[in-house]
Every structure is written in C-alpha cells, then in structure tokens.
Amino acid sequence: MGLDMYLTKRTYVKNWKHKDDKHSVSVKLNGKKRKDIQEDRISEIIEDVMYWRKANHIHNWFVSNCQGGVDECQEAIVSLDQLKELSALCKKVVDDKNPGLMQTVQGFFFGSTDYDQYYYDMCTETHEVIEKLLKEMEDEPKDVYSATFYYQSSW
C-alpha cells in the first residue's frame, strides 16, 4: 500500500498492407513460439520504462505538468519535451542540492516529505533513466513510428 508510480512507453508496430515498412515481432516462451499470440495481430508494444515507490516529489511534478493538476490515478500522456524538462530539473536539484526546485507533497501513504537521501536518489535515478531513454530514441530513424509515453500512479 502506498504511492506506486509508472512510466510506460508504447510503440505502434502495426503492419499495414499499403505500407512498405514492416515490423517483425516475435513472442517466445522458453525458446518456443507462443501459439496463442498471433504476430500479425500485434499492433503495439508496451515497455515498462520506470517504476518509483513513494517518490512523491516526482509524482507532484507529473501531476502539475502532465495531468493538469488533477490527481486521480489517471493515465496521462507525457511528451518527449516534458521528459527532457523533468530530467533537466532532476539533475539541477541534485547538482545544486536545491530541494526547493521540486517540492514534496503529502498524500495517502505517499511516503516521507523530507528532503533526504531518498529524495535525491530518486532525482538521480529519474535523470539517468530518462537520459538513457532519450538516447535510445535519438538512435532510431526519424521516419519510423514514434513512441508515446504515459505516466500513471496508484495508491
């Protein structure tokens, strides 16, 4: 019980007859192709990019910047620009040791509101994961279907 937070990446991979570009997706279990999953029916791949536990300052940022201030455990689209902004802010918080840049928030089992080592560790980890993600995106050809990112929390 408590604040659980998820960032996911969804990549559209549906193959259309009228398109020349084709994705290839294979699902195997113990090296054997899954017969209950038809590759030609796969249209989207969902990746779990990051999971946080009781990082209420990160949650507060998503609520304020991606959810229009509404905190009802709803799923919210997160743009690449927003991810870049969050990454830069997390880095600045750690580099400047300035917790005033990213406020903690109280909530139902949201964890500590102290600006302690866990607070800074979550900022560091968030920055590192987003930077790695942005690098992965940068290396992809610009003409492929782009991914969409989503944030969701539960408690």
Name each model feature, range by range.
Residues 1-155:
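Acidic (Asp/Glu-rich) sequence patches and key acidic residues
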